[in-house]
Amino acid sequence: MKTVFFHGLGQTAQDWKEVVQQLSISDVDCPELFSLTEDEISYSQILGDLEQRYSEVKEPLRICGLSLGALLAIDFAIRHEEKVDSLVLIGAQYKVPSLLIDFQNLIFRCMPNKVYESMGLSKSSTIKLAHSMRSLDFTLQLNNIRCPVTILCGKKDTANLKASKRLKELLPQATLHIVPNAGHELNKYAPNTIAEILNQ
C-alpha cells in the first residue's frame, strides 16, 4: 500500500523528509503540490492534478496531509472513497474560516518576496491560492468518509485545535491525538509522532 504525503501552504515536499526517514515502509509518494500544474494555481487545480496523478492506482492509498494537505486529503477521500484506505489529518480544518484566510493573506502581503522563493510559489500565487480556499466547507460531506481516520494537532496550534476536536466528533471512527509542546507544522515539530502512528 502506498503512503502519500500532502504538505501545507508555505511548505514543500522536503518538509516530510524527517517523517519519511523514520518509516518502516518504502512505498511513499510526496508530491510537490505547487509544481504539479503549469496553469494559474488554485485549490481546485491542485486537487485536479492529484486526481490525475492517482487515477491509475491499483490499491487504496493511505493519505497523510497537513493543513492545506489535510483539506486536500479530506476532499480526495470524499470524492474517491474507493481509492483511500485511511487518512492521517494534521492541523486540519474541514470548514475553512474565511476570516482566518483573510488575516493570513494580510500577513502574506506584508512578507518580503524572498520569503516565498523556498516555497516554489510567488507572493501573488500564494495569496490567490489561499483566496481560492475561502469557500471550502466539507461539513455535509464528511459522512461519506468511512475509512479509518487519525487526527493530529499540536497543543500550541490554537488556530486548528477546536476544529480538530470538532472533526473528531463529526467522524465517529476517528481517533484524535493532541501533541504536547508542538505547534502547527507537526512534520517539523514532531516528525517522530507522525512516524510512530504510520508505523503501527
Per-region residue spans from a language model:
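Gly/Ala-rich beta-loop-alpha elbow adjacent to hydrolase catalytic centers
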Residues: 65-73
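Short beta-strand/loop motif that positions the catalytic acidic residue
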Residues: 144-145, 151-153
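Active-site loop/oxyanion-hole signature of alpha/beta-hydrolase fold enzymes
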Residues: 17-21, 29-61
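Serine-hydrolase catalytic-loop signature spanning alpha/beta hydrolases and amidase-signature enzymes
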Residues: 10-18
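Catalytic histidine-centered segment of alpha/beta-hydrolase-like enzymes
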Residues: 182-192
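Hydrophobic, aromatic-rich cap/lid helix
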Residues: 114-138, 156
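Flexible "cap/lid" loop of the alpha/beta hydrolase fold
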Residues: 43, 78-79, 86-113
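Conserved alpha/beta-hydrolase "acid-adjacent" motif
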Residues: 158-163
